[in-house]
Curated annotation (Swiss-Prot):
Glycans are attached at residues 48, 100, 138, 195, 209, 227. Disruption phenotype: Severely compromises virulence toward wheat leaves. Produces no to only a few pycnidia. Secreted effector that enables the plant pathogenic fungus to manipulate host defenses for successful infection. Binds chitin fragments and blocks the activation of chitin-induced plant defense responses. Protects fungal hyphae against hydrolytic plant enzymes. Induction: Expression is up-regulated during wheat leaf infection. Residues 1-16 form the signal peptide. CDD domains: LysM. The LysM (lysin motif) domains are small globular domains involved in binding chitin in eukaryotes. Mg3LysM contains 3 LysM domains. It comes from Zymoseptoria tritici (strain ST99CH_3D7). PANTHER family: LYSM DOMAIN-CONTAINING GPI-ANCHORED PROTEIN 2 (PTHR33734), MEMBRANE-BOUND LYTIC MUREIN TRANSGLYCOSYLASE D (PTHR33734:SF22). The keyword Membrane does not apply. The lineage of its organism: Eukaryota, Fungi, Dikarya, Ascomycota, Pezizomycotina. Keywords: Glycoprotein, Repeat, Signal, Virulence. Residues 47-91, 120-165, 177-221 form the LysM domain. This is Secreted LysM effector Mg3LysM.
């Protein structure tokens, strides 16, 4: 009987003891860039969001009533056009004054009419347009259209269709090899650091989803494609 009384006493004490307050699910995550709730776009809370394949900052900002540039600022994103699957973003939600313009650089004027070194064909993906493909190769739309007279309507292309891209004569790449994707890699950065275009990478990696690459994936990567200097 004494043991039963002692057990009941201990059980009651356990229930009466003060407990640590539960962690709030709405607590703001620590931003990886700059800013804090109340200082970015008038937001009072941050929400964590894990990027999925096909996501854009514009769509994410709209979903959370945020601003593209506000999200970019908080997460230290230099180029708001490029995010990658599984990237975790801190989103300043319900912005009072969303910023969608200050971080957006004006589109460069493209004057190139051919592609350097490699990438003579391109396989159309879902959502592609002739204009977007030309931009990905850093060539003019007119030059891409001129290379594909077999297509009756440039506004009507379909996934899997192979189109031609104009290659520059007397141009080469220093090397074309394989590369193992590392954490943090995206096609845009790989193209920039190897002096090629995203379109060229897509051309050489038809079966790779450029918005959904993972560490350990192997891609074909050209390096430093350029015009050949005429011999003296």
């Amino acid at each position: 009987m004494q043991n039963i009384f002692l057990a009941a006493t201990l059980l009651g004490a356990a229930f009466a003891a003060p407990q640590n307050p539960p962690t709030s699910c709405s607590a703001a995550p620590q931003p990886t860039g700059t800013g804090s709730p109340g200082t970015v776009c008038g937001s009072t809370t941050f929400t964590n969001y894990t990027v999925k394949a096909g996501d854009t900052l514009g769509a994410i900002a709209k979903q959370y009533n945020s601003g593209v540039c506000d999200i970019a600022k908080v997460n230290g994103i230099d180029n708001p056009d490029y995010i990658k699957p599984d990237q975790v973003l801190s989103i300043p939600a319900n912005c009072v004054t969303p910023d969608n313009t200050s971080c957006v650089k004006p589109a460069p004027v493209i004057t190139n009419t051919c592609v350097l070194g490699v990438g003579s064909t391109y396989t159309v993906k879902s959502g592609d347009s002739f204009s977007a493909i030309a931009t990905s190769f850093n060539i003019t739309l007119a030059s891409l259209e001129a290379r594909n007279p077999q297509i009756p309507n440039y506004d009507l292309i379909f996934p899997g269709q192979v189109i031609n891209t104009p290659l520059c004569p007397n141009s080469v790449c220093d090397s074309i090899g394989t590369y193992v994707i590392e954490s943090g890699d995206i096609f845009y950065n790989l193209a920039q650091s190897n002096n090629v275009t995203v379109g060229q990478l897509e051309s050489l990696n038809v079966n790779v989803n450029v918005t959904d690459i993972h560490p350990g994936d192997i891609i074909i990567l050209p390096h430093n494609c350029h015009n050949i200097t005429a011999s003296a």
